[in-house]
């Protein structure tokens, strides 16, 4: 069945495999998450569960979130996310999902918000080569021509231009789980994931994993 968790990126480190290989890993605090709501195909047209992560005081949340969580009979959470599942009837409102739902060797997709880098030029944002760095030229890091004049008399959509870099939703697919610490709700993922330290991430079964 499909499964997932909300987590928090704690940072990167490295571990050694049994054969001596050094493996770069990202440590994620995955859960515990509480099932707040169920959605079924009969009632809502699709099967999903809504989970909450990072409990907080009711005074720090708005009334809509407090009322929604109170209906579920659970505490108030800072983050609520919906996860598609094959069969929502396998879950009950109030169930606690922890890191132990995953196992070493599982392939997962991790979604997070990339680190924002502000307004950047085309060389940093898109990898343009740029002009000559020598003297006698005033064309160094400029984008150059962005289109023709009379025809088509416009700039095409999706033209690579300077602008905001980062701070967008990014998903990294098929990351392998190296180790699971169920006692501390920690998952070690092989490689890097988007976002800064303490950033919110969503961990789900990989859509491209071999069945």
UniProtKB/Swiss-Prot annotation:
Stored HAMAP family: Ribosomal_uL3_B
UniProt lists the family membership as follows: Belongs to the universal ribosomal protein uL3 family.
Described function: One of the primary rRNA binding proteins, it binds directly near the 3'-end of the 23S rRNA, where it nucleates assembly of the 50S subunit.
- Pfam families found in the cross-reference section: Ribosomal_L3 (PF00297)
Primary gene name: rplC
Q: Which GO terms describe its biological process?
A: translation
What species was this sequence derived from? Geotalea uraniireducens (strain Rf4) (Geobacter uraniireducens)
The protein depicted here goes by the name Large ribosomal subunit protein uL3
- NCBIfam families attached to this UniProt entry: L3_bact (TIGR03625)
Among the entry's GO cellular component annotations, what is one?
A: cytosolic large ribosomal subunit
Q: Which PROSITE patterns match?
A: RIBOSOMAL_L3 (PS00474)
Q: Quaternary structure per UniProt?
A: Part of the 50S ribosomal subunit. Forms a cluster with proteins L14 and L19.
Listed GO molecular functions?
A: rRNA binding; structural constituent of ribosome
Swiss-Prot/TrEMBL keywords: Ribonucleoprotein, Ribosomal protein, RNA-binding, rRNA-binding
């Amino acid at each position: 069945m499909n499964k997932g968790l909300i987590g928090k990126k704690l940072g990167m480190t490295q571990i050694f495999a049994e054969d001596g290989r050094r493996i770069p890993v990202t440590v994620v605090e995955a859960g515990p998450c509480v099932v707040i709501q169920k959605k079924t195909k009969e009632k809502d047209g699709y099967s999903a569960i809504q989970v909450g992560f990072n409990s907080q005081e009711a005074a720090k949340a708005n009334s809509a979130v407090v009322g929604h969580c109170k209906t579920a009979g659970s505490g108030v959470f800072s983050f609520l996310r919906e996860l598609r599942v094959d069969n929502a009837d396998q879950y009950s409102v109030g169930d606690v999902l922890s890191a132990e739902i995953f196992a070493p060797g599982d392939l997962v997709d991790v979604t997070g918000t990339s680190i924002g880098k502000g307004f950047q030029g085309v060389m940093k944002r898109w990898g343009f080569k740029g002009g000559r760095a020598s003297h006698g030229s005033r064309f160094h890091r400029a984008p150059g021509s962005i289109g023709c004049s009379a025809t088509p008399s416009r700039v095409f959509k999706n033209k690579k231009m300077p602008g905001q870099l980062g701070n967008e939703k990014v998903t990294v697919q098929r990351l392998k789980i190296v180790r699971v610490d169920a006692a501390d709700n920690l998952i070690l993922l092989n490689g890097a994931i988007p976002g800064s330290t303490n950033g919110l991430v969503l961990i789900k079964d990989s859509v491209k994993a071999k069945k």
